[in-house]
């Protein structure tokens, strides 16, 4: 039912076209770019629902206030405190290794502003946990493309 609803909204109502070439692994990192708007989260979640996959995401902790916090957590959100220099990469590696399923979407720019210098956390998480990276590129005339990169 969820897949049908997400498919209807994503493909029919919003008019997106997709090309999915990545197998459905039990564990992976999605590197999604470019991140240009707050709508990216919802479009990405609709896309994943439409193809029958689930994924978590990391988001600035400032967004996890009432009533959005419980909703974002329910959607798979992980709050990130960017002001503290904690080893988020090490934490994500530990979670990935101890989980039977681990699907995490990361926007490598780290912000919605144009940033040609991507943050490398997604790569280090994938490398440390031995996960494939799925590259997801969007926003070319309502088209999304996905492919897999093995490290």
Give, region by region, the residue ranges found by the protein language model:
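Conserved small/polar residues in nucleotide/adenosyl-binding loops
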Residues: 140-147
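Glycine-rich, highly charged phosphate/nucleotide-binding loops
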Residues: 81-91
């Amino acid at each position: 039912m969820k897949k049908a609803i997400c498919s209807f909204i994503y493909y029919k109502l919003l008019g997106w076209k997709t090309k999915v070439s990545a197998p459905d692994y039990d564990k992976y990192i999605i590197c999604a770019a470019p991140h240009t708007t707050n709508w990216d989260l919802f479009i990405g979640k609709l896309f994943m629902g439409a193809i029958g996959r689930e994924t978590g995401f990391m988001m600035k902790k400032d967004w996890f206030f009432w009533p959005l916090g419980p909703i974002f957590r329910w959607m798979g959100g992980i709050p990130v405190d960017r002001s503290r220099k904690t080893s988020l990469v090490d934490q994500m590696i530990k979670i990935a290794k101890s989980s039977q399923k681990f699907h995490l979407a990361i926007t490598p720019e780290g912000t919605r502003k144009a940033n040609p210098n991507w943050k490398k956390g997604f790569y280090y998480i994938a490398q440390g946990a031995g996960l494939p990276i799925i590259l997801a590129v969007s926003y070319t005339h309502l088209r999304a493309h996905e492919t897999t990169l093995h490290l």
